[in-house]
Amino acid sequence: MKIWIKTGHPTGEVVRVFGFDWFRLHFIENPGMAWGWEFGNETGKMILTLFRLTAVIFGTWYIGRIVKQQYSKGFIICAGLIYAGALGNLIDSMFYGMIFDKGLHYDAAINDYISYGGIAQFSSNGYSSFLHGSVVDMLYFPIIKSNFPSWFPVIGGDEFEFFSPIFN
């Protein structure tokens, strides 16, 4: 699904799934981790990718352990979904920079990540190097959009959205 999104949609595009307002595909690329947190430059990106590799190795061991110990199916499924997300992010980080012609990438001249226009295509001349690809995120579930009550301390009246993160 990630490859279909990356090669068929421009970044920022939003598609309602089955016409629902609360389930959308919203294509973004993320150089960091959840909620857009990042370690900064290319070195930080490499450290994050190596951390992902370590997490996937640990996750492989852990999934095997909980299956052998016959944990509940629900727990195994939840752990498996988390593991699948981590593995997908690792694959994106390791290889997407080498196999696509466009992607969110770090520009040392401005010390920031820059986006791109258009739709990415497969290419032998990637937009980045091994361990420096950006993660494709697209699942967005804005289930509740409202405002905090005005009497609420500090953030009273501010907009509130549950569930605002875009993930994969």
Explain the meaning of each model-derived region.
Residues M1-N168:
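Alpha-helical transmembrane bundles and membrane-interface segments of multipass inner-membrane proteins
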